Amino acid sequence: MAADETNLIWVDLEMTGLEPEVDRIIEIATIVTDKELNILAEGPVIAIHQSEDVLAAMDDWNQKHHGESGLIDRVRASDFSEQDAIEQTIAFLSEHVPAGVSPMCGNSIGQDRRFLNRYMPTLEDYFHYRNIDVSSVKELVRRWRPEVMDGFKKQGTHQALVDIQESIAELRYYREKVFKI
């Protein structure tokens, strides 16, 4: 499939916490959709190796959720560095979307962009500067059409690939119920 400028890149990161100055990326996943939100391809899901010191510094919430999901064990067993994740992700994306044209798509994507800017700037540069942030749409729906909110439920697995799939489904839901386009 040729790279298409109208395709959208969806990304999700799992991190050891919320502060890019001290916390690290431990998982990355990407999906490419067409402009109608149809999934065209799922990229690699990469657990990124981090030191025991980095993992031990996680707060209780992250220890619990990433422990229960098995992500901590996958991170410990992983041979992938941040650089490996950058290279594999860009190789995947370049097959579907030219550099610099797709907004970064996802939920609370500004947070992911902060971590990419700090630890994976080459990958962050692959995106257009604009974002398609499903959480912004959700906040508007909560205020303008609160009755619509109960119609979509997420699993909340905090697994990168599942989170992206849910974000795409959530935006489809809002498009159908709110935007009607």
Curated annotation (Swiss-Prot):
Pfam family, one: RNase_T
Domain spans labelled Exonuclease: 8-171
EC number(s) recorded for this UniProt protein: 3.1.15.-
Primary location group: cytoplasm
GO terms of biological process kind: DNA metabolic process
Active site per the UniProt annotation: 129
Gene3D superfamilies: Ribonuclease H-like superfamily/Ribonuclease H
Sample GO molecular function, one term: nucleic acid binding
Keywords, sorted A to Z: Cytoplasm, Exonuclease, Hydrolase, Nuclease
Cellular compartment(s): Cytoplasm
InterPro entries: Exonuclease_RNaseT/DNA_pol3, Oligoribonuclease, RNaseH-like_sf, RNaseH_sf
GO cellular component: cytoplasm
NCBIfam families hit by this protein: PRK05359.1
Recorded family membership: Belongs to the oligoribonuclease family.
Function: 3'-to-5' exoribonuclease specific for small oligoribonucleotides.
Name the UniProt record assigns to this protein: Oligoribonuclease
Organism: Shewanella loihica (strain ATCC BAA-1088 / PV-4)
